[in-house]
């Protein structure tokens, strides 16, 4: 049997790029909670002792940007300079302007257009992907890398591994078999974890704790064997981390946010963007479409693409590819997708309830992936029942 190796990586919430994603989405949540019609394009950058929030926001909401920044950093665990950032004493810079009136008139007519008339906030193309290799209908390499990162944060915050600090990265290589287009994971080939730590812990303690408290609870035993390779803090030392170690910027972890390198990506980031930005809402609706195709038994694996022009409600194109795993021809599946999903941005916002803020709704998406999550706020993960004529056995 021919096999191949595929690798996906993740970073946890203390990575400086992810800190920025979370601040940007915390701002979005605050805007939508007070004003669901808010138009938000919020970027964040960070370096030692500094967080800057900038972009274009038009909203009726009264937003305390500095408080949002400090609260978000504090919740992550950046509470002193020695861990990479001090939430209460770092500098916070804010440079927010209103949305360009040229964009506003073209996209939503300065809030005069009905939902079905709202145009895309920009041009672009987005991809949704699904595969039957996991219960989440997500790639196993991505799922495991993401869950390892989430587990790192969990054992740091609950005190199981008190030597952990907020920053960290994970990577998982899985050995796969290609079953006529469907992906069948056979085993985990390599596990890589690089995590920030305090100065007192030894490398042996790090390796022991990571295997016992992070890897074993996350990776099913059936995927591990005597040949699985473990690289646990292979650089030997990772005390300096967070914004002290590296600069951070919103939108630099788009593969981690999506499918871990599987499928495809149109290049647009998610965090800090309201639903008129099809980089986000378009990617959410095509994930629901791809997931629904697989969940309804139309295919074992599927990718869906949609594309837009700025100011135009209707998509320019919709594309479906089932990698040869479709139960019926892809052309018929494409017709089913077009009949069951409304790709107009205003209707995506309504059908996926994307204008609802509060509950840290979009902040939750900004770490550990936007897809494959079991959370009622992730409305795009709800499978739509699709009607199709199943061929007789």
Curated annotation (Swiss-Prot):
Binding-site residues, K(+): 43
Disulfide bond annotation, renumbered to this chain: none
Pathway as given in its UniProt record: Amino-acid biosynthesis; S-adenosyl-L-methionine biosynthesis; S-adenosyl-L-methionine from L-methionine: step 1/1
Protein residues bound to ATP: 15, 167-169, 235-238, 246, 252-253, 269, 273, 277
Comment on bound cofactor: Binds 2 divalent ions per subunit. The metal ions interact primarily with the substrate. Can utilize magnesium, manganese or cobalt (in vitro). Binds 1 potassium ion per subunit. The potassium ion interacts primarily with the substrate.
PROSITE patterns the UniProt entry points to: ADOMET_SYNTHASE_1 (PS00376), ADOMET_SYNTHASE_2 (PS00377)
Induction: Repressed in roots by ABA and mannitol.
EC id: 2.5.1.6
Annotated localization: Cytoplasm
One GO CC annotation: cytosol
GO molecular function term, any single one: metal ion binding
One Pfam assignment: S-AdoMet_synt_M
Organ and tissue specificity: Mostly expressed in roots. Also present in stems and leaves.
Xref: InterPro entries: ADOMET_SYNTHASE_CS, S-AdoMet_synt_C, S-AdoMet_synt_central, S-AdoMet_synt_N, S-AdoMet_synthetase, S-AdoMet_synthetase_sfam
Keyword Ribonucleoprotein: no
Cofactor(s) annotated in UniProt: Mn(2+); Mg(2+); Co(2+); K(+)
Binding site for L-methionine: 56, 99, 246, 277
Family: Belongs to the AdoMet synthase family.
Matching NCBIfam families: metK
Name of the protein described by the UniProt record: S-adenosylmethionine synthase 2
Gene that produces this protein: SAM2
């Amino acid at each position: 049997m021919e096999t191949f190796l595929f690798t996906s990586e993740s970073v946890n919430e203390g990575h400086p790029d992810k800190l920025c994603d979370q601040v940007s989405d915390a701002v979005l949540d605050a805007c939508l909670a007070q004003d669901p019609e808010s138009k938000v394009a919020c970027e964040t950058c960070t370096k030692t002792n500094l967080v800057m929030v900038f972009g274009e926001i038009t909203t009726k909401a009264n937003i305390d940007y500095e408080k949002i920044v400090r609260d978000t950093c504090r919740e992550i665990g950046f509470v002193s300079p020695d861990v990479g950032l001090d939430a209460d004493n770092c500098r916070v810079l804010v440079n927010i302007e209103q949305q360009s009136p040229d964009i506003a008139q073209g996209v939503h007519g300065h809030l005069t257009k009905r939902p079905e008339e709202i145009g895309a906030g920009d041009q672009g193309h987005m991809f949704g992907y699904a595969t039957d290799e996991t219960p989440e209908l997500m790639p196993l390499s991505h799922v495991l890398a993401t869950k390892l990162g989430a587990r790192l944060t969990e054992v740091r915050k609950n005190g199981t591994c008190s030597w952990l600090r907020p920053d960290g990265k994970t990577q998982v290589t899985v050995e796969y078999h290609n079953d006529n287009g469907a992906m069948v994971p056979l085993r985990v080939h390599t596990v890589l974890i690089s995590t920030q730590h305090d100065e007192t812990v030894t490398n042996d303690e790090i390796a022991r704790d990571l295997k016992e408290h992070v890897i074993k609870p996350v990776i099913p035993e059936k995927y591990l064997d005597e040949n699985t390779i473990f690289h646990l803090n292979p650089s030997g030392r990772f005390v300096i981390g967070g914004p002290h170690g590296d600069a951070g910027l919103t939108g630099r972890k788009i593969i981690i946010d999506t499918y871990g390198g599987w499928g495809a990506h149109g290049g647009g980031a998610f965090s800090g963007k309201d639903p008129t930005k099809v980089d986000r809402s378009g990617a959410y609706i095509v994930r629901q479409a791809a997931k629904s195709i697989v969940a309804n038994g139309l295919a074992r694996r599927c990718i869906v693409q949609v594309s837009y022009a700025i100011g135009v409600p209707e998509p320019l194109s919709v594309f479906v590819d089932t990698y040869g795993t479709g139960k019926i021809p892809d052309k018929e599946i494409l017709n089913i997708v077009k009949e069951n999903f409304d790709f107009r941005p205003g209707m995506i916002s309504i059908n996926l309830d994307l204008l609802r803020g509060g509950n840290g709704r979009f902040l939750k998406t900004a770490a550990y992936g936007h897809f494959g999550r079991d959370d009622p706020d992730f409305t795009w993960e709800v499978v739509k029942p699709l009607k199709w004529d199943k061929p007789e056995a």
